[in-house]
Amino acid sequence: MDDIMSPNFSIPSIGHAPTPIHHSLDADQQIEALPHQVYHPAALDPTPTATTTVQQQQQPDGNNGVSAADGSGGSNLFGHEPSIPLAHKQSYQPSASYQQQQQQQQNQSSNTGGTTPQSLMQPQTPQSMMSHMMPMTSAAPPDASLSNIHQTMGPSTPMTPATPGSADPGIVPQLQNIVSTVNLCCKLDLKKIALHARNAEYNPKRFAPVIMRIREPRTTALIFSSGKMVCTGAKGEDDSRLAARKYARIIQKLGFRAKFLDLKIQNMVGLCDVKFPIRLEGLVLTHCNFSRYEPELFPGLIYRMVRPRIVLLLPAPGKVVLTGAKVRQEIYDAFDKIFSILKKFKKQS
């Protein structure tokens, strides 16, 4: 102790006497003497990148065992840690099993003198490293390729498209006829109308009203002497209103003080083909309270639906006629209900 405190005491040079630090440095230099055994993904590209620059800074110097980055070199004295590309470090987080496996490999390499594991000598691809990684959805960038990989890793459930309740979306009833009534609010001379109006027929011995027709929209009107008029033959609600106004305008031009009041739709007729034959005998036995089938009088089955209040004519080929509706939606609702019933009585060809 007195010799150390004396002014003549000098610290021996590092290069003169071998110390345990020099021995560990020699062993570390022997481990790093074969750099070709460690696989670096950036070594395939001759151009310097950010990954290769970081790896070059982390490699120890051959003379003094100190790294070029911070000059400490403490982490390289106890073994070489396999390098992973920065893209994988940022995008994935090692699982607990993978960390435990890496710790065992490091312990084995330190016990056996720092030999490189065989797995590090093989080229690693992102697909091979994917098995030990867990995706970090919060930190990972929204990449299309990574999202596809995540979908394959998670449990996949088949998605079934939504289907309508009863009717096929391709089978929709079409309106064939709309019957509407209107009040002209004046007494009419039917003989004068038949003589001066075009396309008008009047035969009081056979039929009391005047029958008048127009081409656009293609409809027929029944004009009574009381001032009431019935318009039939339109394919839609707007066409029925337009046709009734045209008939009222013709009456006004003939000198009558006709008005246009109380237009009401009295009946809608729809037609639809279910595209399969129907067993009418089985249907009338099962739904005897709502149906009537007399093939000697009428070849089709008459089905009277309570709600909505619609009458359906069901012939055997499957072309359904719906009548008695006041609104278009009643036609659609009635067909949805009858279609689910008709599927049970489909005739096997």
From Swiss-Prot:
Residues 112-130 have a biased composition (Polar residues). Sequence repeats lie at residues 175-251, 265-342. It comes from the Eukaryota. Its main location: nucleus. The keyword Repeat applies. Residues 1-22, 42-142 are annotated as: Disordered. GO terms for cellular component: nucleus; transcription factor TFIID complex. The keyword DNA repair does not apply. CDD domains: TBP_eukaryotes (cd04516). It is found in: Nucleus. Keywords: DNA-binding, Nucleus, Repeat, Transcription. Belongs to the TBP family. HAMAP family: TATA_bind_prot_arch. This is TATA-box-binding protein.
